[in-house]
Amino acid sequence: MFAPRTAPWPLVALFTAGYLPPYLLPTTVGRLDTGLPLTATQAGAVGSALLLSSATAGFLLASRMQRLGARTPARLGLALAFLGYGAASLTTAVPAVVAGAVLGGLGSGTAMTVAATRIAAERDPHRASTLGLLTVSALAGAVYLTVPHLGRAHGLPLAAIALTALAVWPLTGRLPGPEAASPAAHGTGTTSPLPGRRSGPVLAAAVLCWSLAQNSLWGVSGRIGLTQAGLGDAALGVVFAVALGAGLLGVLAAGALGPRLGRAMPVGAGTVVIAGCIALTASATTPTTFAAGEIAWNTLYPVVLSYLIGLAASLDPRGRWAVLVGSASSLGTAAGPLTGSVLSAQAGYPGMGLVLAALLLVVAAPMTAVALHTGGRPLLPGAIRRRGGTPAALVAAATGTPSGAVPEVGAPEQPVVEITVDAPAVPVRGAYDTAGPRQAAAAPGPGAG
């Protein structure tokens, strides 16, 4: 495993390769619309198929990651991503583009699942997930700034994703194989029951709707900026890059705040504010209003997302809920482009924004309730320590940090487990001899005198 004070760069890189397709969704869907004989709704459906394939990989692998290890699935996922997205970027035949996008989505979803599982098992998972969000946001911002100057070809965003997968491949050699157990699962059986059977499904369903609302707007943001707000292609790329840069600041702010606000307030209040940002962006008719809505929205989105990742990871130190909730989020993300296209076609962009904002206000309540339920009574800092002497209460208090092998801040103490000893106790005193030297052939007994 990686050294405690060393950033797990292979996981960060794998996280980046897996999460890049959703970040590039607006330009991917927009270029499919303009560069291929597809309608806006059909282009959104291709984007949804890509992300649905990614979510499917997460659901299929969620319960198998500990047995498969990280190295082999990561390499397979990166290979599929490179081949699928690469092929889709090099052809203009619509069936081949769709097939390549679906194959690439399966690969990026596999990479995302491996990264989520291993990050949840890290001693400091918040640090790893924060670095991953920072890296993918920076890379996506660079793509948004660069791609408009390279032409109008539909395959440029897809090629960027394929090349990222290729660049990450050499780092997979540092990932553990199937024989290496995760730190959080050390000492636990492979058949331990899934905890959080009430909170987990509620959180997964709410996060699915949360992601659906976010990505319904994100999938049509490019068209809103071009057709309703009056931006050019290059100016739109700058707005997206600045918005993702603001998201970097949001992630850093979340890391700095850590446990000070708990999880309930960032998740609940953050979602309410995001609802307002979505309504503002969808109704924008000027470049200034559109840019303000996009930047504010993208500043808050990764903040709330980091707390949701941590909330899911805290439900199970083996990372199973982190993967399942992440896959539910991917399902919402997958349905986003098609949902946004259909809603905007039926109700217009402002009407779509109001519907999505209302959905976010509805799901804010159950997500906040799960965060409050997971919080509970705080532990005294330093009362329990992890290996290495770090106070567990302080480690678990960090935003997005699952409890691992010790209770999380606010969680009840773990029960004491009775351990069965194979060797039975000696039943009679006659089995003992008196202290002192014994003759070699003497039988044990109570001794003379």
Locations of regions flagged by a protein language model:
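A late C-terminal transmembrane helix in Major Facilitator Superfamily
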Residues: Y19, L315-A357
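Helix-to-loop junctions at the C-terminal end of transmembrane segments
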Residues: T56-T72, A120, L249-R263, S344
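C-terminal transmembrane helical hairpin of 12-TM major facilitator-type secondary transporters
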Residues: L261-L308
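Intracellular juxtamembrane helix-capping segments at the cytosolic ends
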Residues: G109-R123, P302-P317
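Short amphipathic helix-loop junctions that connect adjacent transmembrane helices
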Residues: P26-Q42, G219-A235, G310
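Structural signature of the two symmetry-related core transmembrane helices
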Residues: T72-G86, M265-L280, L354-A357
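Helix-loop-helix hairpin linking two adjacent transmembrane segments in secondary transporters
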Residues: E122-H126, T130-G177
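Cytoplasmic helix-loop-helix junction between adjacent transmembrane helices
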Residues: V94, G100-T135
